[in-house]
């Protein structure tokens, strides 16, 4: 289904999601391809707000975390779900007694129950599911085989499987192990909003400075989804707030694109440069105006005014 709207300035700002195409008014000669989520504030638990392109005539394309996002969007975390039985139930893992670490819900797995990042209960999407039957009639209790050993350390991090992740890291020392795209367990956890996993990995030696093959960072991935708690943890570790990857974006540009106001403010207060431009020549303010994100625009304007006042003083 395609929808188009003529622009007042003779150009189009096109937002594409899967086969759907939307047309919005915006800046001249800009084409943006990305999953449409204009009302997002804190990052969706089910989607990935990345994968955008800024296209201008005779300009370089900007693909935000393209390879990683493509694998997540097209396969819908296929690498994780292919190894999980469709009948598995979400259950609790009493891991607090051993590690005193809380897990958060896993957006990368589809189960019968819907959870959000705000859920605080312990869980394990791959824990054995138990079917209770009437023993008086001769029926026995049936269980589903446990598949944790078949999951990679990256999949465990993305799902928030704290118990199995901690055991795997202790046994194999793979806390900074990279996948085929150069992504670490920390990057996967940051991209999926797994706050407790990110905290656990950082406390146990995960390197937040490591980059993917396209120079993607854990901070950029977290900013693209608006996970403010994770963004704060990474900033507290001293990561480069202005890390510019080969896809043409910085953490601030990703946060602006996702309309994540709190992340934008946090990044600016931590020294993010609002004047850095994409490969297409647009800075964070240009992008906020083009996408119609007024709240983000106001945050950037307020920050720029403070900078000007400090210069005058």
Swiss-Prot record:
The main place the protein resides is cytoplasm
Q: Does the keyword Membrane apply?
A: yes
Task: Extract the Gene3D superfamilies matched here.
Answer: Ankyrin repeat-containing domain
Mutating residue 188 to A: what's the consequence? Loss of interaction with CCDC8. Decreased affinity for HDAC4
Question: Entry's InterPro entries?
Answer: Ankyrin_rpt (IPR002110), Ankyrin_rpt-contain_sf (IPR036770)
Give the multimer and partner information.
Interacts (via ANK repeats) with CCDC8 (via PxLPxI/L motif); mediates the interaction with the 3M complex which is composed of CCDC8, CUL7 and OBSL1. Interacts (via ANK repeats) with HDAC4 (via PxLPxI/L motif). Interacts (via ANK repeats) with HDAC5 (via PxLPxI/L motif). Interacts (via ANK repeats) with LRP2/megalin (via PxLPxI/L motif). Interacts (via ANK repeats) with RFX7 (via PxLPxI/L motif). Interacts with AHRR. Interacts with NEK6.
Q: What does this protein do?
A: May regulate the interaction between the 3M complex and the histone deacetylases HDAC4 and HDAC5. May also regulate LRP2/megalin.
What's the name of the protein? Ankyrin repeat family A protein 2
Write the lineage as a comma-separated list. Answer: Eukaryota, Metazoa, Chordata, Craniata, Vertebrata
Query: What is this protein's gene name?
Result: ANKRA2
